[in-house]
Amino acid sequence: MAKDIKFSADARAAMVRGVDMLADTVKVTLGPKGRNVVLEKAFGSPLITNDGVTIAKEIELEDHFENMGAKLVSEVASKTNDIAGDGTTTATVLTQAIVHEGLKNVTAGANPIGIRRGIETATATAVEALKAIAQPVSGKEAIAQVAAVSSRSEKVGEYISEAMERVGNDGVITIEESRGMETELEVVEGMQFDRGYLSQYMVTDNEKMVADLENPFILITDKKVSNIQDILPLLEEVLKTNRPLLIIADDVDGEALPTLVLNKIRGTFNVVAVKAPGFGDRRKAMLEDIAILTGGTVITEDLGLELKDATMTALGQAAKITVDKDSTVIVEGSGSSEAIANRIALIKSQLETTTSDFDREKLQERLAKLGGGVAVIKVGAPTETALKEMKLRIEDALNATRAAVEEGIVAGGGTALITVIEKVAALELEGDDATGRNIVLRALEEPVRQIALNAGYEGSVVIDKLKNSPAGTGFNAATGEWVDMIKTGIIDPVKVTRSALQNAASVASLILTTEAVVANKPEPAAPAPAMPAGMDPGMMGGF
């Protein structure tokens, strides 16, 4: 395929146009008075959202060079979302600010490599300063406060803090759609392990790329499943019940995997295969945990069992199983309460005798998975559009809350970024490195400027007053008042803020050091088919 190539200033200018189109769309959502963005969907009603990463992923530009700039910023939002689960709009605003300030200096003749070095040094200093002013989050009330700020709903904050109290900070919390209009919290027994489906063709929901199995059977084995004939009699028995099947095995390969996938695609029966969690002796123990939780038996040579001899009585059962590309969640296993209690007691006794910190950590993980359960927040709303928007907000809030528990909190509303300016400004750098530092200093102001602008205030005035205010005091854009941010509950998780800054600085630096951009040349439109010989155009009925 032929390529289009742009160089130097032309290349950077084209990419920056794409950066601006995406960032200008996303940044209107920032802050307590941020607006919504309406996204057209190929099917169904439009999606109304203020979630930065959701908006960024939807944007495709016609110009290939501009689209590359937009996609790089979208990558910043996605990466921040993957690491911290929130802060995607802040990351986008920071990226745009660093790119714009950097481009001015590069155009004026500054060395992009020196600027990049200065940006990296200043960013590292800002991150350390953020960690130094972080306050730990503990207690139900503090957790509820973090969740309420992220979701813009005190009720959601209460649900998330209640869920984390019930299943632990590292417990499994899922978000589902409610059948009614009310949002409610439900805690059910369950287990999660870090293994996803072996083929994406096994998913049942193509939009979310997850496989949901209702009332499934579970085959648990530490063997490889390579020959489909080994499990064919068992598959035929499961097929008669018209219920789905989850296969947990050392691996599923050879002819077995394509055969299972083909039957899934044809709709013969619903089957999902995942690899067994853990390794070595720990894998055997975890498979036994799953078997006890689900009322099944591990098909293993240790018990003298072969796959070809497995019967329906060896299969575990559960009310529901959800599998995505990275993890499997088993909800309401059919194992007996007595067997589960005995297993928990055994693990606790092993905890008392182990001398290895690593073994202790893994035993505690197994204990939490067996006894902790799964919290389900069932989201209700009057319309489908409102339901989707609410789900996105709760997902962001849950991620932000976990990030806050992990690394602590700082004053929100961009205040913490203004606070660390003093530390960054104190860096003694020279030449283009100093220019890079100054670019970061200007970018650190941008989230506050945008929050103020979205709320109808002049950003520069707010920033000047903020720089001269006592530590911890900030601007509440929702009310227009100057308050103690943390006491008022306007807070941001450190992990969210630092991830946004680190990812923004990384990608913005790459854009500034770009000297050539290569894009695919658009394919020429195919010529219209020739009219048959001897045919009179007037015979076409005037169309």
From Swiss-Prot:
<dbReference type="InterPro" id="IPR018370">
    <property type="entry name" value="Chaperonin_Cpn60_CS"/>
</dbReference>
<comment type="similarity">
    <text>Belongs to the chaperonin (HSP60) family.</text>
</comment>
<dbReference type="GO" id="GO:0005737">
    <property type="term" value="C:cytoplasm"/>
</dbReference>
<protein>
    <recommendedName>
        <fullName>Chaperonin GroEL</fullName>
        <ecNumber>5.6.1.7</ecNumber>
    </recommendedName>
</protein>
<dbReference type="GO" id="GO:0016853">
    <property type="term" value="F:isomerase activity"/>
</dbReference>
<comment type="subunit">
    <text>Forms a cylinder of 14 subunits composed of two heptameric rings stacked back-to-back. Interacts with the co-chaperonin GroES.</text>
</comment>
<dbReference type="InterPro" id="IPR027413">
    <property type="entry name" value="GROEL-like_equatorial_sf"/>
</dbReference>
<feature type="binding site">
    <location>
        <begin position="29"/>
        <end position="32"/>
    </location>
    <ligand>
        <name>ATP</name>
    </ligand>
</feature>
<keyword id="KW-0547">Nucleotide-binding</keyword>
<keyword id="KW-0067">ATP-binding</keyword>
<keyword id="KW-0963">Cytoplasm</keyword>
<dbReference type="GO" id="GO:0042026">
    <property type="term" value="P:protein refolding"/>
</dbReference>
<feature type="binding site">
    <location>
        <begin position="86"/>
        <end position="90"/>
    </location>
    <ligand>
        <name>ATP</name>
    </ligand>
</feature>
<feature type="binding site">
    <location>
        <position position="492"/>
    </location>
    <ligand>
        <name>ATP</name>
    </ligand>
</feature>
<dbReference type="GO" id="GO:0005524">
    <property type="term" value="F:ATP binding"/>
</dbReference>
<feature type="binding site">
    <location>
        <position position="413"/>
    </location>
    <ligand>
        <name>ATP</name>
    </ligand>
</feature>
<dbReference type="InterPro" id="IPR002423">
    <property type="entry name" value="Cpn60/GroEL/TCP-1"/>
</dbReference>
<dbReference type="GO" id="GO:0051082">
    <property type="term" value="F:unfolded protein binding"/>
</dbReference>
<dbReference type="GO" id="GO:0140662">
    <property type="term" value="F:ATP-dependent protein folding chaperone"/>
</dbReference>
<keyword id="KW-0143">Chaperone</keyword>
<dbReference type="InterPro" id="IPR001844">
    <property type="entry name" value="Cpn60/GroEL"/>
</dbReference>
<dbReference type="InterPro" id="IPR027409">
    <property type="entry name" value="GroEL-like_apical_dom_sf"/>
</dbReference>
<dbReference type="Pfam" id="PF00118">
    <property type="entry name" value="Cpn60_TCP1"/>
</dbReference>
<keyword id="KW-0413">Isomerase</keyword>
<dbReference type="InterPro" id="IPR027410">
    <property type="entry name" value="TCP-1-like_intermed_sf"/>
</dbReference>
<comment type="function">
    <text>Together with its co-chaperonin GroES, plays an essential role in assisting protein folding. The GroEL-GroES system forms a nano-cage that allows encapsulation of the non-native substrate proteins and provides a physical environment optimized to promote and accelerate protein folding.</text>
</comment>
<feature type="binding site">
    <location>
        <begin position="476"/>
        <end position="478"/>
    </location>
    <ligand>
        <name>ATP</name>
    </ligand>
</feature>
